[in-house]
Amino acid sequence: MSKKLWGGRFEKGTDKVVEDFHSSIRFDQRLYKQDIRGSIAHARMLGRQGIIAASEAEQIIEGLEKIMADIEAGRVEFDVAAEDIHMNIEKILTERIGDVGKKLHTGRSRNDQVALDVRLYLRDEITETGRLLRELITVLLERAEEHVDTIMPGYTHLQKAQPITLAHHLLAYVQMFGRDCSRLVDCAKRFNISPLGSGALAGTTFPLDRMAVAQELGFDGITENSLDGVSDRDFAIEFCGAASLIMMHLSRFCEEIILWSSQEFSFIELDDAYSTGSSMMPQKKNPDVAELIRGKTGRVYGDLMALLTVMKSLPLAYNKDMQEDKENLFDAVDTVKGCLAVFTPMIRTMRVRGERMKAGAKGGFTNATDVADYLAKKGVSFREAHEIVGKMVLMCVQKSVALEDLSFEDFRACSEAFEEDVFDAIRVERCVADRKVPGGPAPDAVKAAIQAARERLS
Ligand code: ARG
């Protein structure tokens, strides 16, 4: 049994089973960079404040920089017995530079150290996730620009409702992913403050310059209460909440991709590079990527629920339960990034079958509202017009024809308000073009929306 950094008050070593059980080095080694950055800033401040000698601070910093380089080069092996990344690095440091290494932890606890590391980690990952989201939005805007005139059916209840365009449909997702971006930014804004100096729970007797450390590490300020500084994991939960919404949006889009690429819809064809085949059925081309993203949505929701449940009812301040925050947080980060990285090129390369979309927009009485609107514009009340057109649809269903296939006499028989111009007014192109209201599907409104989204992006 190995000697622990905290072993002073113990008469016996840790049982081997316990050692394996409570060690987190297997997963928290991913925080090595943040841990070393934090330690360097802490050591520099200790030296500047005269808490340790300036030369000692220098030795520590130099030692930490070498450890960083060695970890990066794959030359460091971590030790399960040293528990976590924080103690592994401190242990290596002391092995290398001698007793002066033991001064690094002055005025610090692993509790504020780990709170710092996770914040630094998440800050970088939020930047990367935001970049991936903006890349997706850029591709959506490019594809929308191509398809401003590509008419397709819009649905409610997955029943054909009214004609829209593919561009308009894609722009709905631009809105969702735009909100996701702002949620990430907002979340980072709230947690970008340094907990170092909170100590184990009650701060420290050493005259630390918390603000200087925070500034060196790129924080906007410091946490205002030492208990909260070490026991707050709201930011991890907020991130998982934001990540869950990203996944929810991706899964809705994926569901449509899966439907649209079915033979029954045939609205799109995924590129071969983003589809897979069947081991038995030679004809198959499956939208596995979209399905897998839809499936992975569940794990990110699971990560969110796991974190909420870990934190539920924990008394202040730090409790070892909180070591369980990392694997779920890392999983959410990896999953959302992995999904975005494959979803974006899948959308960029998918082939759109405009003729199939337009054909789809034509069946199913998608212009029925336009017939009613036509009557309302000719002075019939909308409620009455709705009733008249409902009867016309019933008549069409019985005859198996579309509204535009009715003769002018048929129209007149239903309402005297119909004139010859009704046929032009209910063409599917007109149905789209006349919905010029801001936020609507008319090509000019969509072009304006693309322009506005581009401006927001830059
Ligand atoms: N590995 C620990 C964690 O991730 C670090 C903090 C440990 N603190 C303690 N008092 N045992 O939560």
Curated annotation (Swiss-Prot):
Its main location: cytoplasm. GO terms for molecular function: argininosuccinate lyase activity. Keywords: Amino-acid biosynthesis, Arginine biosynthesis, Cytoplasm, Lyase. Pfam families: ASL_C2, Lyase_1. CDD domains: Argininosuccinate_lyase. One of its GO terms (cellular component) is cytosol. It is found in: Cytoplasm. It catalyses: 2-(N(omega)-L-arginino)succinate = fumarate + L-arginine. GO terms for biological process: arginine biosynthetic process via ornithine; L-arginine biosynthetic process. Pathway: Amino-acid biosynthesis; L-arginine biosynthesis; L-arginine from L-ornithine and carbamoyl phosphate: step 3/3. HAMAP family: Arg_succ_lyase. Belongs to the lyase 1 family. Argininosuccinate lyase subfamily. This is Argininosuccinate lyase. It comes from Heliobacterium mobile (Heliobacillus mobilis). The lineage of its organism: Bacteria, Bacillati, Bacillota, Clostridia, Eubacteriales.
